[in-house]
Amino acid sequence: MKHLLTLVFGFFFILTCKGQELQTIKLNEPQKDRGFSVMQAFEKRHSERVWADKELSLQDLSDLLWAANGINRPETGKRTAPSSMNKQDIDVYVCMARGTYLYDAKAHELKPVTAIDVRAEVAADQKEIAKAPVILVMVTNYPRLSDSKNALISGAIDGGIVSENISIFCAGVGLATVPRTWMNKENLRSYLKLQEGQELIINNPVGYKK
């Protein structure tokens, strides 16, 4: 009987673990005709650190990621965010309550990284930040940058450009965000499974205005 109970418990444990496995999320095509004009978006851009208790819709998430660092010229694979010598060194990690994903710009989808909610690690000691439904974390990949002498500054600049894309998009469609460089980097490196040569640069929590 004891052996049977052990088998039953093990079976349900496996089912539970499988139920927690993340699946690839196919994003919607971006709606390119939405939002304020470019000049109005610049006028409205400001930092906000409070969000409504509501998840982003799939369409808003899809548009946000495309604006951040999506492909806007499919024939060449070039991005909405320029990068040093077009090396496309910036990866965007999408941190949510359900877990963390890596944005695949070519497929315009989210690839699972971990089922752990890492928003508190991104927020560090600023606990209110962890309440944002989505936090985008920009990571540079130094090996992609051929000019190793300037890789540090190039990676930082490229990450900042993606962050600014996020800020302008949010201003243009009425979402709330704030660019931040503070995060628990050592813990995040482990959770995001970063390799040598990958560096956390900046993050943008995003949500609906409260």
Protein language model features and the residues they cover:
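Bacterial Sec-dependent N-terminal signal peptides
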Residues: M1-L22
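Short, small-residue-rich loop/turn micro-motifs
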Residues: Q31, M138-Y142, Y208
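A glycine-rich helix N-cap at a beta->alpha junction
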Residues: K193-K210
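N-terminal amphipathic, basic helical "cap/leader" segment at the start of enzyme domains
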Residues: Q20-A132
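Small-aliphatic-rich amphipathic alpha-helix that forms the alpha element of a beta-alpha
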Residues: R45, L64, V92, V134-L188
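Conserved active-site beta-strand-loop modules that form the wall/rim of enzyme catalytic pockets
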Residues: G10, G99, A132-M138
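Short secondary-structure capping/junction motifs at helix and strand boundaries
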Residues: H3-L4, E75-K78, L175-A176
